[in-house]
Amino acid sequence: MTTQQTVKIQLVRSPIGTKESHRATVRGLGLRKLNSVSELKDSPEVRGMINKISYLVKVL
């Protein structure tokens, strides 16, 4: 049985004033309010989403 690798991300900047696609990416990662933390499966799809909004989030 393999264990899933996870990645924790925290929203550190407000998505107000950003592109609509970036706001949708923030919501897609499960982040809502400022400083909210989400733990997700570490996959290429999630890594791409994090890379897209790297200026808004911090990887913990």
UniProtKB/Swiss-Prot annotation:
Gene3D superfamilies in the record: Ribosomal protein L30, ferredoxin-like fold domain (3.30.1390.20)
HAMAP family reported in the protein's UniProt record: Ribosomal_uL30_B (MF_01371_B)
One Pfam family cited in the UniProt record for this chain: Ribosomal_L30
Disulfide bonds: none
Record's GO cellular component terms: cytosolic large ribosomal subunit
InterPro entries: Ribo_uL30_ferredoxin-like_sf (IPR036919), Ribosomal_uL30_bac-type (IPR005996), Ribosomal_uL30_ferredoxin-like (IPR016082)
Keywords of this entry: Ribonucleoprotein, Ribosomal protein
PANTHER family, sorted: LARGE RIBOSOMAL SUBUNIT PROTEIN UL30M, MITOCHONDRIAL RIBOSOMAL PROTEIN L30
Domain of life: Bacteria
GO BP of this protein: translation
GO MF annotation: an example: structural constituent of ribosome
The name this protein goes by in its record: Large ribosomal subunit protein uL30
Family that this chain belongs to: Belongs to the universal ribosomal protein uL30 family.
Protein species of origin: Paracidovorax citrulli (strain AAC00-1)
Subunit record text: Part of the 50S ribosomal subunit.
